[in-house]
Amino acid sequence: MSFSAVTKNELARVAGQRPCCRLAELSALIKMDGSLQISARQQVSINIITENAAIARKIFTLIKDLFGINIEVLVKRKTRLRKNNVYLVRIPPQQGMGEILNRLGMVDGAGRLEGAVRPDLLRRECCRRAFLRGVFLGGGSVNSPEGTYHLEVITGSESFARYICKLMGRFRLAARVSRRKKWHVVYLKESDQIVEFLNIIGAHSALLNFENARIYKDVRNQVNRLVNCETANLNKTVDAAVRQLENIYLIRDTVGLAQMPEPLREIAELRIKYPDASLKELGDMIQPRLTKSGVNHRLRKIGEIAEKIRSGKK
């Protein structure tokens, strides 16, 4: 099961403490996955579709707790591509439907369809958190923290996407909106922001798993950087030692090491004897002890002599 699916299953078990929070969450779920159906007799029903059984159960429970009305649940199995079940939670036409639509913010007081989210649904911060939870359950996903950090919510309405982005902004989340074919995507890319969003909507187990994976990933990346740095330094050291030996052998085989001043001859002989030694180790072998810069200076002088030989200047 993906990290996103595990997160949604956790959120499907989170119950809003107040009726106002449960109403806000249900309203968001209907905004994301629901539709109004009006029959020829002007009878109104609400259809909410999801592929997640836990979310379908939550929608059913929220409607029962809030309104105590008749609900229909239909299950259809897909036959093409993914063979997941599709769950239809339906509020059929019945007495008091107008009041239900009004409380959900789907119509105004005069019975006209309401496109925007009614402000009175989200007066409290707890209701705003519940609404965002419903939004994520209805159309959200989050990447595994082991990969690229990314959390998104997809909706077909640009105005609703902008509203979600603005609502996230009230919690100091720097969400952005982009277009993906016919869909509008509200997304977060920063790991800290994703962690905060999971905290806001009540996905605390997912948050802890995300943090653990993020820490492991950060440590692994840091170790890799250190290893790469050490490898690069080692390669430089090896390349330098090979160059130094080439210079020394050239001098030895042409004019002879005895032609060099004593300090240079001493370091040349040590380099031949200890080809894998570091500059510090070479310096420690000389009496009095020589610093790394001192050893490097002598080897550089040897290099200059070798270059003169290569260019024909004896």
Swiss-Prot record:
InterPro entries: Homing_endonucl (IPR027434), Intein_endonuc_central (IPR004042), Sporu_reg_WhiA_N_dom (IPR018478), Sporulation_regulator_WhiA (IPR003802), Sporulation_regulator_WhiA_C (IPR023054), WhiA_LAGLIDADG_dom (IPR039518). Transmembrane segments: none annotated. The keyword Chaperone does not apply. The keyword Electron transport does not apply. GO terms for biological process: cell division; regulation of sporulation. It comes from the Bacteria. Keywords: Cell cycle, Cell division, DNA-binding. Coiled coil: none annotated. Disulfide bonds: none annotated. Residues 278-311 bind DNA. It holds the Pfam family WhiA_N. One of its GO terms (molecular function) is endonuclease activity. Gene3D superfamilies: Homing endonucleases. NCBIfam families: DNA_bind_WhiA. Involved in cell division and chromosome segregation. Belongs to the WhiA family. This is Probable cell division protein WhiA. The lineage of its organism: Bacteria, Bacillati, Bacillota, Clostridia, Eubacteriales.
